[in-house]
Amino acid sequence: MEKLANTQEPIDKLISKRWSPRAFNPEFIIDKKSILSLFEAARWAPSCYGDQPWKFILFLKDDITPWTRALNCLSIGNQNWAMDASILIVVCANKLFTHNNEPNRWSQYDTGASAENICLQASSLGLAAHQMGGFDEAKIRNLSN
C-alpha cells in the first residue's frame, strides 16, 4: 500500500511515501536479501568519526521463540499490531567511542540516522517500518544477555 504524505512543499517521493502503519500482513515473511539491504542502508548513515555507534538485534518471526520474547517486551498497545510484523529490530546506541572509550555525545543522534535509513530503505523496497518507544527497557536489555 502506498500512502503519500500531503506536504506543504515538494519533497522526494521516498520521504513522502514513508509512513508507520499499524497493520501488517501476518503471512508475509521478509526475505534475507531485503534484510541485508536494510542493514546496508543503516551502515551508510553518517556518524561522528565514522564510529557507527549503533547495534541492531534482529528477531525474525520464523524463529518464533526469540521473536515472541522480543514481542513481549513491547507495551500492550504495540504488541497488538506488532504481532503481525515479520521482523522486530531493537536499535541500540553505544554511548562510548570505540577508538578511545570516551563519551560519544552524538551516539543517539547517529543511531537515529541509521534507524531512519532503515525506514527509508524499507519504503524503497515496498516494505514498511514502524519505529516505537513503547517497550520495557529492562526486558529489552535481558534479551541481549
Short names for language-model regions:
Residues 1-87:
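N-terminal amphipathic, basic helical "cap/leader" segment at the start of enzyme domains
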